[in-house]
Amino acid sequence: RADEEGVEPIDIVNKYHSEFLDYWEKLSISWDNYTTTMTDNHKEVVHDIFLKLLDNGFIDKQKTLQAFDPIDNKFLPDRYVEGQCPKCEYGEARGDQCDNCSSTLDPEELINPVSKLSGNPAEFKETEHFFLKLSLLGEKLSPWLETKENWRPHVINWAKSFVKDGLKDRAITRDLEWGIDIPVDDLGDEKKIYVWFEAVIGYLSASIEWAKNSGDEDAWKEWWQKEEAESYYFIGKDNVPFHSVIWPAILAGYGQLNMPTNVPANQYILVKGQKASASRGVGKSLADYLSEWEPDAIRYTLASVLPEQSDSELTEEEMVRRNNEELVATWGNLVQRVFTQIQNNKDAIKTPSSLETVDEELLKEADKAFIEIGKYIEAVELKTALQESMRY
């Protein structure tokens, strides 16, 4: 993106960080710590993870082929390479992943790979990089995945299949001009730690940053080291490989840190049968929705059509219907009637000496709803939880 706009990478980082922050605030979403993976704290945590994995024998150096653009005379990051997916034959697969079938890839696996910089066929040159030894870490993941039968089927089935097929060692450094420096000097300054490895470490570094800001530098340990602490990773299905296998592999290799409790990945939101994507011009951007709808209407509609088990279609007509029939006519009407009664009769209502049968039944129903809906929330079945809330 920086190359496309003719600016420095840090300018792109700052631009989108600011935009995302603005979007979340407009959607009334709050947080304890909103940060980036550009902080000194994050770099320190990444270096600590890297060195510990190196000491534990889960990182080593290997020679490999990396995509190279002969026109621009530079090595290409994986996402600067596009071609046909060798598994599903999708024509616009990237060098690290296919958006169509969610397979993780290496650039040399693509059929007819081309450079996104020049549009010319990519060449492959030998270079040396640090690799995460997933071939060893897979042994730690198999028994752990067997305990995750409560995960969504498409997540656990994919993760088990990925590990069962045999994990390949994966390069965690690249010939890049911009990124986090490698904490050892073996390969020179022209190589950096690659984003797919260090980005997921942001969950841990953000927690450590939050602890420092709270005044208790060890507070993060309560959430990452105590056995009873739980962690849930809410992602899209294109990120399943990184959160169900690769991040757990890093945690297992490091040791002393909790593995994910659940990875409730959603499938895709579709617009006229196509995956919603602002970058590809499919569907509206969040900015467009925010300019036309109130935050509650957006959040309610998205929660109503969450693609928890399969892809879901989102249409303008559906947003209008749910807003008018459910939020306004049903929920809004109930709230309006209740508040009107309270406003008009607040001085006439006395505390009863005892509850009538109808009152007791209503309270029992409320208790039942709280328990039933809570079970759905704990199981991360949020769409059903919302449906049951509206039904009650």
Feature map (PLM): residue ranges:
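N-terminal, positively charged nucleic-acid-binding surface of large information/translation enzymes
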Residues: 1-144
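A ubiquitous short alpha-helical element
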Residues: 7, 271, 290, 353-359, ...
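Hydrophobic packing residues in well-ordered alpha-helices of helical domains and bundles
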Residues: 13, 46, 359, 366, ...
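Structural signal for well-ordered, non-membrane alpha-helices
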Residues: 21-24, 50, 54, 332, ...
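Structured secondary-structure scaffolds
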Residues: 35-36, 41-45, 111-344, 379, ...
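Generic hydrophobic alpha-helical segments
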Residues: 50, 141, 159, 372-373
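A glycine-rich phosphate-binding loop feature that marks nucleotide/adenosyl-phosphate handling sites
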Residues: 66-71, 265-269, 317-319, 351-360
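Acidic, turn-prone loop/beta-hairpin segments
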Residues: 349-374
